[in-house]
C-alpha cells in the first residue's frame, strides 16, 4: 500500500466524507492509528490479500490528544489516536493507572515500544496480566464517539459506568478490530495505581502442578493480581541465572500492608517447595516481559508464527505435551493459565497444516486460538474466532450489517 493510498481526515466531516465516498466507489478502508499492530486481525489480512486494487488506509492519527482528564473523578477522555505512552505519562503523574494493564505489542511487529494508541488497544480489547483480577479493557470503557460504515456519527456511553440509555455500544465496539466503525474519541475509567508490588515465584514445577498453584493463589485471600508459568526456555531469557521453570505470582497494594500478604502467601505455598521473592523494580520488569510477550519480540523468535490460545485454565497444562510434538516451538502461560502464547518457528514446513493442528488443539481443550503474527494468507484463515458456532456467526453478521452493511471496514467476518 503506497502513501498515495492513504486517507487522513483531520475532523469529523472529513472522516464522514471519506467513508461515504468509499461506499459509493465500492472501496474498502483499513483503519489504523500508528500502524503498530499491522496484521493483528483476520480482517486486515483478508483486505491485504484480496482487495489491494481498491483498498485505502484510513489514517486516524489526526484524532489525537487528551481533551478531558479529571483525576478526582477518575475519568479520562482522549482521541482514538492518542499514544498510550502519553496517556500513561499523565496517569503516572497523578498516581493513577488503567486497571487492565494495557500491553504494548508494537515490538512484536518490529515497531518501537510505546508506539500503540488508545484506539488500537480498545479496538483489539487488549488486556494485560492483571486482567484476571481487574477485568478486561472492555470493562473500563465509559463512552465512545465513532462513525459507522454508513457514514453516520454516533455517541454512546458517558462519564459513569452505569448505562441506562440503551445498548452498551462501547462494549460492543471494544474488540471489534475496526470492522464496525471508526472510533474518534474514547472515555475511560481510571483508578489509583498501586503503591508497590512484589512477585513470589516457585521453581521447577511441572505444568499441571503450576496451574493448580496459580488457580489456588488467584482464588485465595491474598489478592494475587497476576499469575504466569514460564517454561525453562522462556524463563532463562528474563532470569539468565535460572535453568528451571518459573511459576510467578504477583501481589500489589499499599507499602504498609503488602509485606504481610507476601509472607502469608509464601507460607501458603510451602507444600510446593521454597519460594523466592522479587521486589518492586524487578517485579515490574518481569511482568512487562510477560504481559508484552517480549520473548517473541527479540532474537530468533521475532519471525515466529505467533498464536494466542484462550483456554480453560484447568486444561492449559496440556499445551506442554502438544508443543513437544510440534518441534521447534515455545510457549508460556499468563492469566493463571487462561492465556497461552505459542510461537512456532517460521522455518517450519507445512505451515498451514501446523496451524490447523494448533486450532484443533485449542478446540479440543474447550477454548479457541487466534493467529496474531504470520503471513497474510495464514492470518486470513486462522486470525479470526474460528471456534464460533453457526448461531454466534449469524448474530455477528447481523451486527456487522447494522453498522457496516457495505463492508467498508471489513469484507470478511472477524
Residue ranges and their predicted role:
Residues 1-38, 43, 50, 273, ...:
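N-terminal accessory segments
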Residues 2-29, 52, 59-112, 122, ...:
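N-terminal glycine-rich flavin-associated loop
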Residues 33, 81, 249, 342:
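Residue-level signal for inorganic ion chemistry
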Residues 46, 53, 108-109, 273-414:
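Conserved glycine-rich FAD pyrophosphate-binding loop
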Residues 85-86, 207-212, 256-263, 315-321, ...:
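Short, conserved charged micro-motifs
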Amino acid at each position: 500500500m503506497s502513501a498515495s493510498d492513504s486517507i487522513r481526515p483531520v475532523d469529523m466531516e472529513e472522516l464522514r466524507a471519506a467513508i461515504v465516498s468509499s461506499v459509493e466507489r465500492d472501496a474498502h478502508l483499513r483503519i489504523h492509528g500508528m500502524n503498530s499492530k499491522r496484521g493483528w486481525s483476520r480482517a486486515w489480512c483478508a483486505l491485504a490479500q484480496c482487495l489491494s486494487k481498491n483498498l485505502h488506509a484510513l489514517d486516524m492519527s489526526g484524532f489525537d490528544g487528551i481533551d478531558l482528564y479529571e483525576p478526582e473523578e477518575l475519568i479520562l477522555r482522549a482521541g482514538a489516536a492518542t499514544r498510550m505512552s502519553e496517556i500513561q505519562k499523565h496517569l503516572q503523574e497523578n498516581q493513577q493507572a488503567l486497571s487492565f494493564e494495557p500491553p504494548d505489542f508494537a515490538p512484536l511487529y518490529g515497531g518501537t515500544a510505546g508506539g500503540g494508541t488508545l484506539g488500537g488497544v480498545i479496538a483489539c480489547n487488549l488486556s494485560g496480566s492483571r486482567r484476571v483480577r481487574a477485568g478486561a479493557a472492555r470493562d473500563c470503557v465509559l463512552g465512545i464517539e465513532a462513525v459507522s460504515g454508513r457514514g453516520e456519527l454516533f455517541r454512546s456511553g458517558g462519564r459513569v459506568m452505569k448505562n441506562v440509555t440503551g445498548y452498551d455500544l462501547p462494549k460492543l465496539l471494544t474488540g471489534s478490530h475496526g470492522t464496525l466503525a471508526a472510533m474518534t474519541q474514547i472515555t475511560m475509567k481510571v483508578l489509583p495505581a498501586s503503591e508497590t508490588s512484589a512477585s513470589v515465584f516457585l521453581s521447577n514445577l511441572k505444568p499441571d502442578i503450576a496451574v493448580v498453584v496459580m488457580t489456588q493463589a488467584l482464588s485465595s485471600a491474598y489478592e494475587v493480581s497476576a499469575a504466569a508459568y514460564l517454561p525453562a526456555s522462556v524463563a532463562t531469557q528474563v532470569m539468565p541465572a535460572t535453568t528451571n521453570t518459573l511459576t510467578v505470582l504477583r501481589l500489589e497494594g499499599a507499602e504498609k500492608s503488602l509485606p504481610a500478604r507476601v509472607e502469608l502467601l509464601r507460607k501458603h505455598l510451602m507444600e510446593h517447595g521454597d519460594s523466592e521473592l522479587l521486589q518492586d523494580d524487578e517485579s515490574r520488569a518481569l511482568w512487562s516481559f510477560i504481559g508484552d510477550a517480549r520473548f517473541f519480540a527479540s532474537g530468533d523468535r521475532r519471525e515466529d508464527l505467533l498464536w494466542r490460545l484462550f483456554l480453560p485454565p484447568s486444561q492449559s497444562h496440556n499445551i506442554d505435551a502438544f508443543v513437544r510434538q510440534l518441534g521447534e516451538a515455545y510457549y508460556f502461560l499468563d492469566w493463571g493459565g487462561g492465556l497461552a502464547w505459542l510461537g512456532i518457528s517460521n522455518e517450519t514446513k507445512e505451515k498451514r497444516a501446523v496451524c490447523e493442528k494448533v486450532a484443533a488443539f485449542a478446540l479440543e481443550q474447550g477454548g479457541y486460538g487466534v493467529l496474531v503474527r504470520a503471513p497474510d494468507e495464514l492470518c486470513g484463515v486462522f486470525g479470526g474466532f474460528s471456534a464460533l458456532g453457526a448461531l454466534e456467526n449469524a448474530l455477528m453478521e447481523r451486527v456487522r450489517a447494522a453498522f457496516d452493511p457495505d463492508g467498508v471496514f471489513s469484507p470478511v467476518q472477524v
